[in-house]
Design a protein with these regions (language model features):
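Gram-negative bacterial Sec-dependent N-terminal signal peptides
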Residues: 1-20
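Short, well-ordered beta-strand elements
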Residues: 23-37, 54-59, 149-153
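Short coil/turn segments
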Residues: 33-35, 118-120, 155-160
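Short, polar/charged alpha-helical segment
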Residues: 36-55, 166-169
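Pocket-flanking alpha-helical
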Residues: 42, 61-97, 187, 191-195, ...
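Ligand-binding pocket segment of bilobal, Venus flytrap-like solute-binding proteins
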Residues: 75-80, 153-233
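A conserved helix-loop-strand patch within extracytoplasmic ligand-binding domains
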Residues: 98-153
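C-terminal lobe and pocket-closing loops
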Residues: 213-263
Length: 263
């Protein structure tokens, strides 16, 4: 988490030392979502704004619907727009007007299914990280609630919809694997910790940059992403995730109502 926070903090809206007299007294509304690093950064950013003399409010928000909330002015900014998960919602809101691209962080991102690296080091599923190794490893990843199949633990369904269930079927793994959805990032990290303690294999959704970069995590290598490969875009959905950008979004009025905070 420290790595991600450092990257995001370095790329946050460039802030001058003191609040401008032009900055509105209207609160800057910052959303909080269902993954811990986003919540931590929301309060870090809010603290910076408050130190400049700005008023700040925090509101829980759905990670897809937040861009409509920004467009309508109910939310002011979003500091973590991950391309693979939220790019479409972000651009759809921009196309309607009211949302602006407030810049791109330097880090490239990847959002994908993977395994803790020790699963590979212990050779629990020979052939990983190549996805085809999964054909012979369902028992390694079976859990009490997976009905004898191997389990993929996805993030909340609001993040990607049916992207992973479609991929499992498209790869011909549907008879051997089932996708379960976690309630939030904390549930993913809890499963990761439990798997390590129990010495069992686990396939979970993860992203980079993240604190697990240092802990040791390996993304599974699925068929390469190409334009149009996902089912929603006319493909069969078997492809993996693309490397992508990490952006910031803001209400179109923000540069005018809070020029010092935005500059």
């Amino acid at each position: 988490m420290k790595k991600l926070i450092a990257i995001l903090a370095a790329g946050i809206l460039a802030l001058p030392a003191a609040v401008s007299a032009e900055d509105s007294s209207k609160p800057i509304v910052i959303p909080t979502h269902n993954w811990s690093s986003q919540v931590v950064m929301a309060y870090v950013i809010g603290g910076i704004f408050e130190s400049m003399g700005n008023n700040v409010e925090y509101v829980p928000a759905d990670s897809q619907a937040v861009y409509e909330a920004i467009r309508s002015g109910d939310v002011t900014i979003s500091h973590e727009v991950w391309q693979s998960s939220f790019g479409k919602s972000f651009y759809n809101a921009m196309a309607k007007g009211g949302v602006i691209d407030a810049g791109t962080h330097a880090a490239m991102t990847l959002e994908e299914m993977g395994v803790p690296t020790w699963v590979i080091e212990k050779d629990l599923c020979p052939g990983l990280p190549n996805w085809e190794a999964l054909k012979n490893c369902k028992d390694v990843f079976a859990t009490a609630d997976s009905g004898g199949k191997g389990r993929w633990l996805e993030g909340p369904q609001s993040w990607h919809g049916d992207l992973m269930p479609v991929r499992v079927d498209a790869l011909g793994l549907g008879d051997d694997y089932v996708v379960k959805f976690a309630g939030g990032a904390d549930a993913l990290w809890a499963d990761l910790a439990a798997a390590k303690k129990e010495g069992r294999g686990t396939i979970i959704f993860n992203w980079s940059p993240n604190f697990t970069d240092a802990e040791g995590f390996t993304f599974i290598e699925f068929p390469e992403y190409t334009d149009g490969c996902r089912k929603a875009d006319g493909g069969d959905g078997s492809c993996g995730s693309p490397k992508g950008w990490l952006k910031k979004a803001a209400n179109y009025k923000f540069p005018k109502t809070h020029p010092a905070a935005y500059t």
